[in-house]
Amino acid sequence: MNENIAEKFRADGVARPNWSAVFAVAFCVACLITVEFLPVSLLTPMAQDLGISEGIAGQSVTVTAFVAMFSSLFITQIIQATDRRYIVILFAVLLTASCLMVSFANSFTLLLLGRACLGLALGGFWAMSASLTMRLVPARTVPKALSVIFGAVSIALVIAAPLGSFLGGIIGWRNVFNAAAVMGVLCVIWVVKSLPSLPGEPSHQKQNMFSLLQRPGVMAGMIAIFMSFAGQFAFFTYIRPVYMNLAGFDVDGLTLVLLSFGIASFVGTSFSSYVLKRSVKLALAGAPLLLALSALTLIVWGSDKTVAAVIAIIWGLAFALVPVGWSTWITRSLADQAEKAGSIQVAVIQLANTCGAAVGGYALDNFGLLSPLALSGCLMLLTALVVAAKVRITPMS
């Protein structure tokens, strides 16, 4: 019965892709991600200006992720049948307001309030991203549209920290957030002009969010999502100490490694649609398997700089398939409840990021330099096995 509902949902979809709207969504996502990570490169001047420690100032990033987790879980319950066009506009307005609140903050409390506004927009937008995409393009074009959106994410992740640091040294951290507010205004304008009316879920289709986990293969999928992102953050959060102490990179060398990783991630995202068109399941199982082998390679031969640098590139290419692949899985296998599935997915990812970084840090402190790599490799291998054995992928109609 669920398959029939999904087929009907696809049949009622759009006939021609609305690429202007897709790029508007991608631009909004890029702006949200950029603003999320701006404080990482501006912590010192922010802390000095507000009279707080850098550790306290760093909580401006934590509060955004924390609010985003709850926003993603409850946003679909709150907005119900509201036209999604207005909701996306609201998120763009919240992005702009967040930047202005941070820019004019004269206290830590106002700073956190501004960053909480960003978390509301970030979590809500991510929860709706898959369902928005599948309503803007035909089913056959969804992987390509998702690769555009996640390509924007890759670009934002690459440029956010260095751009913030560069501009902060020239115009000051407050004006960096003022410039980000201008980007928010551009988001509002672009969304207003390009995004069509997207009515909310009819009342007869409403279903408890967590009842989706009872569908065959869905719980396994969410477990696989958790393990893959936890595995990523268990290692990548500590890539600096691992690469500097294991492979002997200096700061400049590490910068080049991270830049190579970012470029590889962008390339992987850009070409992900071609892989996913052939087999979503192969991509979702193959990518973590390749990452598990990469972790093993680093453990055995990571002291060689060339090997370590190549593995960073392979890691960026392979992991790029993971977020696009799981969003594609939602649009294929949970098409009739894509918003609610997206809400659970984003919450799972946020929790996985937190747990992966925390456990990876504990392992690094207590079991040595290679332990985050070993933890990451084990989680990636388990992900591949769960996907191969338990996750179901609905064929594209």
Swiss-Prot record:
Entry's localization field: Cell inner membrane
Membrane topology, from the record: Multi-pass membrane protein
Principal subcellular localization: membrane
Catalyses which reaction(s): inosine(in) + H(+)(out) = inosine(out) + H(+)(in); guanosine(in) + H(+)(out) = guanosine(out) + H(+)(in)
Gene3D superfamilies with a match to the protein in the record: MFS general substrate transporter like domains
Superkingdom, natural source: Bacteria
Gene Ontology cellular-component annotations: plasma membrane
Pfam families: MFS_1
Key words of the record: Antiport, Cell inner membrane, Cell membrane, Membrane, Transmembrane, Transmembrane helix, Transport
Transmembrane regions: 22-42, 55-75, 86-106, 108-128, 148-168, 176-196, 216-236, 256-276, 282-302, 306-326, 344-364, 367-387
Function noted in UniProt: Involved in the efflux of purine ribonucleosides, such as inosine and guanosine.
HAMAP family from the UniProt entry: MFS_NepI
PANTHER family noted in UniProt: PURINE EFFLUX PUMP PBUE, PURINE RIBONUCLEOSIDE EFFLUX PUMP NEPI
Protein name: Purine ribonucleoside efflux pump NepI
Gene name per UniProt: nepI
